Amino acid sequence: MAIEAAALLVIDVQVKYMEPEPMVTSDGPDLLEKCGGLIDAARANSIPVIYIQHVDPDAPPDPELIAIHPQIAPNADEPIVQKTFGSAFMKTELENVLEQRGLSKLYMCGLATFGCMNHTVLCAVCRGYDVTVASDGHGTSPEAGPVDEQMAHFNRMWERAGATLQKAKEIEQRFAT
């Protein structure tokens, strides 16, 4: 039985952020595996999957680089919401997509912890959505500082803001109940 009014948002897991050097989780280079597990569990339990895709407004789009990573590619019936700002809510169709489908509980995974994940989580909480973040299912660049410290910092901040934090495997199990 699907969780009522729930959706999985997969944020910016695009080729340009995963190749040649992937953004990583505190467990290492396993973001695609964790997001893929969440996607598979959502699909198996009739929970809509919505992809968010960042497009740089100041650069000509390179279809190969901005594509959702092929390892977690969307099905033909799964929406891809394009954005040009950090938040998936700012000047996009995301709220319309959620409203049309009656979705108010959002599970999130993706990139980048310090950027688009952060902005999207906080905007969703401020808009009154029930937000659960995969605490080990968001990734960042080691160049921005120690990955485990970055993830722990943002996880604490999101929890203080009102989001729920669960490991990706726990969310997969939740989807199945």
Show where each model-derived region lies.
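A short alpha/beta connector and helix-capping loop motif
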Residues: 22-50
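Short acidic, Gly/Ser-rich segments with clustered Asp/Glu that frequently serve as metal-coordination loops
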Residues: 16-20
